[in-house]
């Protein structure tokens, strides 16, 4: 299957998000969760392009006490240093308030180092107390488009304090082989300080 890249995905994203709207079935939340769960990495892309870092993304389902929505835990780390992830977060998946998109809402963990390798624990032990995670005021909204899901961060991006960035934006494409992501950080002057430029990061599914 050919995966959308570069400017093509921008056109596809605009088309998908500006198409006539309709209420999505709840099953779309489960489909997005299945796309995200498991292990993906950028090792194949990094072997071809030297400036692309080799990164692993690990995502698993968790239970948040008192929550009716579906929650995932996700961490990203350089493959050479998996025990020191540079990004850890919980994702709440639900339909958006208008029912027309799937919303992935980010929550930040209390004491992130205590959650490292959470996905290696048995499913029944991955139970999270609600007061140990904090709403990060950041959402990605996804819509189905053919056999893909395409998503963007909320208008204006998300607040950040990471590697010189005060704002982050992302466009993601979920597909059968994994995920393409245009993850970018911008400083207070609106200048990009890290992240994807001419090409997306290409995360591809691994057997685990």
Can you name each region flagged by the protein language model?
Residues 26-50, 54, 62, 77-208:
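Calycin-type beta-barrel ligand-binding domains and close structural analogs
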Residues 18-25:
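Boundary at the C-terminal end of the N-terminal hydrophobic targeting segment
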Residues 7-16:
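Bacterial N-terminal signal peptides
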Residues 71-73:
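Glycine- and aromatic-enriched membrane insertion/assembly motifs of diderm outer-membrane
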Residues 1-5:
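Positively charged n-region of N-terminal signal peptides that target proteins for export
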């Amino acid at each position: 299957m050919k995966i959308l890249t570069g400017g093509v995905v921008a056109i596809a994203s605009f088309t998908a998000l500006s198409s006539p709207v309709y209420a999505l079935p709840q099953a779309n939340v489960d489909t997005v969760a299945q796309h995200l769960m498991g292990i993906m990495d950028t090792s194949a892309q990094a072997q071809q392009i030297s400036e692309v870092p080799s990164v692993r993304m690990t995502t698993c389902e968790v239970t948040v006490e008192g929550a009716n929505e579906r929650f995932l835990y996700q961490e990203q780390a350089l493959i050479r240093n998996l025990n020191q992830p540079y990004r850890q977060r919980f994702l709440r998946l639900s339909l958006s308030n208008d029912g027309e998109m799937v919303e992935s809402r980010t929550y930040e963990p209390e004491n992130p180092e205590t959650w490292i390798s959470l996905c290696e624990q048995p499913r029944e032990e991955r139970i999270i107390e609600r007061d140990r995670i904090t709403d990060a005021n950041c959402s990605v909204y996804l819509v189905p488009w053919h056999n893909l899901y395409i998503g963007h961060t909320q208008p204006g991006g998300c607040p950040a304090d990471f590697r010189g960035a005060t704002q982050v934006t992302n466009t993601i494409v979920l597909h059968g082989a994994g995920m393409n992501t245009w993850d970018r950080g911008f400083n207070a002057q609106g200048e990009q300080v890290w992240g994807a430029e001419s090409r997306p990061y290409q995360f591809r599914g691994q057997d685990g």
